[in-house]
A protein has these predicted regions:
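Beta-strand elements of well-folded, non-transmembrane domains
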Residues: 1-2, 14-20, 60-62, 77-81, ...
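A surface-exposed loop-and-adjacent beta-strand signature within N-terminal beta-sandwich domains
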Residues: 2-58, 186, 200
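Intrinsic-disorder/low-complexity, polar/charged segments enriched in Ser/Thr/Lys/Arg/Asp/Glu/Gln
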Residues: 51-55, 86-88, 141
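Short glycine/proline/serine/threonine-rich loop/turn segments at secondary-structure transition edges
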Residues: 62-74
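Short beta-strand elements
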Residues: 82-105
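Well-ordered beta-strand positions in beta-sheet-rich domains
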Residues: 38-43, 85-90, 179-181
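Localized sequence-composition bias
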Residues: 103-123
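C-terminal interaction module
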Residues: 117-216
Length: 217
């Protein structure tokens, strides 16, 4: 309190909220999707030249949205109108470490190239393109939907493929989409010491990639 007067009924709010950058510019509170909120200080009084210190904690969920070019999690802080007039901190949220390790298996073991990473409604979408090799002649790209929900690792692969299909005695070029789903429990994807089970990741991903290794479909 930098003034010479007593200040009463002090309220401090902290809100963890998700916002699309072009939408939150309007200042409309409805543009935010609240994840969690706390009120570290409520109804306090502050003497002239005094200050209040308080501890607080906001935890991110395992399946919280990551930061990308269009949207992010923000920490909003202020008083009664924190959503409209409060300050904000743009949080740089990365992919969950276990999901990051799972994803790295594509790039390190199978030489896929990551093209983009986006936060969707309840998962992270990653676009992967295959290496130039004879192993995946029909594969154009993979959309990988990743999340950890209630401690379970869930991944859905959407394969975009092209190849040859039999039409009687003839062969024709066709394009198709295939899907493969992987689910793992913490007992499966974690080793003692909470290290990621990279060997299992390789096995699961290799099983999924068998779809793309088929030359005729």
């Amino acid at each position: 309190n930098m003034s010479g007067n007593l200040v009463t009924s002090i309220q401090s709010s902290l809100v963890l909220a998700y916002g699309v950058r072009k939408e939150i510019k309007s200042g409309d509170a409805e543009a935010w999707k609240i994840q969690s909120e706390i009120m570290p200080i409520s109804g306090a009084s502050l003497d002239p030249q005094g200050e209040i210190n308080t501890e607080w904690e906001l935890k991110l969920n395992d399946d919280c949205p990551i930061t990308d070019k269009s949207a992010s999690l923000f920490l909003l802080f202020g008083g009664d109108k924190v959503m409209e007039e409060g300050g904000r901190i743009d949080l740089r949220v990365e992919l969950h470490p276990i999901l990051q390790s799972f994803l790295q298996t594509f790039t390190t073991q199978f030489k896929f190239l990551e093209k983009h990473r986006k936060s969707k409604e309840d998962h992270t979408e990653v676009k992967l393109v295959p290496p130039e090799s004879k192993e995946f002649p029909n594969l154009e790209q993979i959309l990988c939907m990743l999340k950890i929900h209630e401690e379970q690792l869930e991944s859905v692969f959407q394969f975009k493929m092209k190849g040859f299909s039999r039409d009687g005695e003839n062969m024709k070029v066709v394009k198709k989409k295939r899907e493969f789903e992987i689910q793992m429990t913490p007992e499966e994807y974690l080793l003692p010491g909470d290290f990621p089970n990279r060997q299992l990741f390789r096995e699961k991903i290799s099983e999924a990639l068998d779809i793309a290794r088929q030359r005729v479909f």
